[in-house]
């Protein structure tokens, strides 16, 4: 009995679920019926409006062409009537002269005859009939106003509802990835004059193959494209690839997307490695700020943790409050934090080949800052540019302003104002490290060296801050300058 009740309960549950599904489907069908009525009324209204527009155009054309016929008829009628009136008057004058001549011919008085004959002769000379052109000024042919609308009639008879546009085909051979821009070119398989615009979608990915159904990044949409090409500008290439697809749209409907393509977007990505930074630097992923209390705060926390319960003396420098190298050993390859007066932080990604580019913006009020590259082996007490393990540009705004290139404790003064944003270009295999004004791409300095170890981006700042921009491709202007100036570089050989 209990088993039967349980079975009946299951049946009731199943029926209730099915009833709910059916009710939902019924509601959906009713909504679809309403939508059919509304959408039908909408497209019918649009169709009537389009035909009314065509009718209006035809009526306007008809009135315009009828007016042309009327104007031509009036002009020709006016000319012919004037010519007819002139000829009629000439004929009447000629007939009068003819009658006078006949009467004179029958006269018997010789003296009267001679006088009349002379007058008739003079009258004939001045007669209008002899000065008139007996050729009509205009033609009665109106064939130039004939029409043949057979072709237009066929076009009207071919009117139909808008077809769904075909899917475009992306032309990879004509597409280009350069200067953090992507230029995409596509074409339509069939000529379609009804296409109103195109929609382009793109998203970043780290997967090389065909686009996957699920990605961490959503599709970004660009609408209203009128041509069969488009350039995406101002991109940050923080992932290895980009998926792109395009669809065509007419006034009514959008077609299917093209086959998606995957374009490689090579660029140098790194973050600041906080485990290497001086304690007086507050480091985030791509920015750092000098903090006079940073080392002291760390020292206080360390001492409190050890139970010593006393703070560092206010007169102590940040370097004096820094724990020993053994205690500050970093988890990244045994790299210790920089200390003493080396207010330095390194990037977290090695450069062991190829070309790379990044930009750095320093706070204008920074008292001193530097940027460049260094070997991982750069000592924790060593400042950028003062050993053979690092190359940098250094700006000093404290007491006496200076802008210099430094390597192996050798200095070259640069005859250039300090830009608000600096670009760094490293060509590892060519042994070139170049610095540019990031805005104008003016070359500031180039180091020539033979790099014997992988490099790390390196930065230093005192009483200031900086922001790094990564995910950048080597700009075309920089590549051109490097090729053009490879033989006559601005580098100082004494700094290599």
Swiss-Prot record:
The B30.2/SPRY domain, residue ranges: 290-477
Localization recorded for this chain is: Cytoplasm, Cytoskeleton, Microtubule organizing center, Centrosome; Nucleus; Cytoplasm; Cleavage furrow
For this UniProt entry, what is the primary localization, expressed as one broad class? Answer: cytoplasm
Q: Where is this region: Disordered?
A: 301-336
Coiled-coil segments = 4-99
Q: Which cysteines are joined by disulfide bonds?
A: none
Report a single Gene Ontology molecular function.
Answer: identical protein binding
Q: Which UniProt keywords apply?
A: Cell cycle, Cell division, Coiled coil, Cytoplasm, Cytoskeleton, Methylation, Microtubule, Mitosis, Nucleus
> Which residues does the UniProt record annotate as the domain COS?
105-162
Q: Which residues carry the post-translational modification Omega-N-methylarginine, per the record?
A: 310, 320
* GO annotation terms (biological process): cell division; cytoplasmic microtubule organization; regulation of cytokinesis; regulation of mitotic spindle organization
One GO cellular component term of this record is:
cytosol
User: Domain Fibronectin type-III: where?
Assistant: 164-268
The domain-related comment in the record is: B30.2 box contains a microtubule-binding site.
* Quaternary organization: Oligomerization is required for binding to microtubules.
Record's function text: May be involved in microtubule organization and stabilization.
Full protein name: Fibronectin type III and SPRY domain-containing protein 1
Which species is listed as the source? Mus musculus (Mouse)
């Amino acid at each position: 009995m209990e088993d039967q009740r349980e079975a009946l309960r299951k049946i009731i549950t199943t029926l209730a679920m099915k009833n709910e599904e059916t009710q939902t489907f019924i509601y959906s069908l009713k909504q679809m019926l309403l939508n059919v009525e509304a959408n039908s009324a909408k497209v019918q209204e649009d169709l009537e409006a389009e035909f009314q527009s065509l009718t209006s155009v035809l009526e306007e054309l008809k009135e315009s062409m009828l007016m042309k016929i009327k104007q031509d008829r009036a002009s020709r009628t006016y000319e012919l009537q004037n010519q007819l009136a002139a000829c009629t008057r000439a004929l009447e004058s000629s007939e009068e002269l003819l009658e006078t001549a006949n009467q004179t011919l029958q006269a018997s008085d010789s003296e009267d005859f001679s006088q009349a004959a002379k007058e008739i002769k003079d009258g004939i000379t001045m007669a209008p009939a002899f000065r008139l052109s007996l050729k009509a000024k205009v033609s009665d042919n109106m064939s130039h106003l004939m029409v043949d609308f057979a072709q237009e009639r066929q076009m009207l008879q071919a009117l139909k509802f808008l077809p769904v546009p075909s899917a475009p085909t992306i032309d990879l051979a004509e597409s280009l990835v350069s200067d953090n821009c992507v230029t995409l070119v596509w074409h339509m398989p069939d000529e379609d004059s009804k296409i109103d615009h195109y929609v382009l979608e793109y998203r970043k990915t780290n997967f090389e193959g065909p686009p996957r159904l699920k990605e961490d990044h959503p599709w970004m949409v660009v609408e209203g494209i009128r041509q069969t090409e488009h350039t995406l500008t101002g991109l940050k290439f923080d992932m290895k690839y980009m998926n792109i697809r395009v669809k065509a749209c007419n006034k009514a409907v959008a077609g299917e997307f093209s086959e998606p393509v995957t374009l490689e977007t090579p660029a140098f990505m790194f973050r600041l490695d906080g485990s290497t930074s001086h304690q007086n630097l507050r480091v985030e992923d791509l920015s750092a700020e000098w903090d006079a209390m940073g080392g002291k705060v760390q020292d206080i926390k360390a001492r409190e943790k050890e139970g010593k319960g006393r703070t560092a003396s206010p007169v102590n420098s940040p370097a004096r409050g820094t724990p020993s190298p053994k205690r500050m050993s970093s988890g990244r390859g045994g790299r210790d934090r920089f200390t003493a007066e080396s207010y330095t932080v390194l990037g977290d990604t090695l450069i062991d080949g190829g070309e790379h580019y990044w930009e750095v913006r320093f706070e204008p009020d920074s008292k001193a800052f530097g940027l460049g590259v260094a070997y991982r082996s750069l000592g924790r007490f060593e400042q950028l540019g003062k050993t053979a393990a690092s190359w940098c540009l250094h700006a000093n705004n404290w007491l006496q302003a200076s802008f210099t290139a430094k390597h192996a404790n050798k200095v070259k003064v640069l005859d250039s104002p300090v830009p608000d944003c600096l670009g760094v270009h490293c060509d590892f295999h060519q042994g070139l490290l170049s610095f540019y004004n990031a805005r104008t791409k003016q070359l500031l300095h180039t180091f020539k060296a033979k790099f014997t170890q992988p490099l790390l981006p390196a930065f230093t700042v005192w009483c200031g801050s900086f922001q790094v921009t990564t995910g950048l491709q080597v700009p075309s202007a920089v590549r051109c300058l490097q090729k053009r100036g490879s033989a006559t570089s601005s580098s100082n050989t004494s700094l290599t």
